[in-house]
């Protein structure tokens, strides 16, 4: 390429990358985002003929001025700060606005007001201007931290970076994050409610398979990036990307309590809401009162289905008043996310790993759910076909 790739999105691009724009990245790791930001502003300065460019030295002078006046970067580690500096100015001596925040996640989570003051002080110290307005905040925040729970237990933190960016009050925010917040995610209920009710989110670009965005990363549920515009108030333009296919529709985010990622599914959801829900025949969790670690014997009157296989229990092990015991029913595994939540070769997701019809005197542990229940095997077979 004779020059780097440049993407123009009209008014937003013109505003964000104006010659006098100030852009902040939170959590730079390699400096690639600041590099693109610096190039875009450099391009705007040259295009607007603010500087005469007749030599490599002139180009270098303009570049250094952009990095010194327009780009501000916060890093989570000293190494990230060093790499970002090298990306922007190489090994030369030039002014660069980078700062390493020790324990960045903890500061944003537990001391947000203090963090905002420190960011303001950092920018004031570098520019000599108090309360400078940041035009845009961008970034690829950390996605999660281990929370010390049983087994592999991680808590999302990317939501904290979106929230702190809004508190800093720029004109624009654009960050990329996992798409799990659309409908789930540990501790993300209030964040999801806040996002879906925020009319300032003008665009969401949703990659159903994260590998379409990050080819070497496995991120269950995909990733998305947003454009938040302080001056926008309206429906959101939602683009869903699946391989080479793109589907775009403008619609409100707060139609439902969760975000429906597929535009084509909206009318289906509306139609289904007018009918009886399948949830009405899904039984409560652990209907037989058997924990997931229980294992039976080699013989008995009741067949026990566990994640380890088939065993047997005496009839006295189950409450005789349990209405499910004497009926046909559907055994179903709890929702899973096999292959790290990524689609298979056919682009399909495996959501339920096991479903089967079980009969009278068949029970299961808490590893499974029970759907439907009838003395008629035909009724249960029809319910099974629906699943």
Q: Where are the regions a protein language model picked out?
A:
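SAM-dependent methyltransferase catalytic region
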Residues: 1-204, 209-213, 222, 226-238
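C-terminal substrate-recognition regions of SAM-dependent nucleic acid methyltransferases
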Residues: 209-387
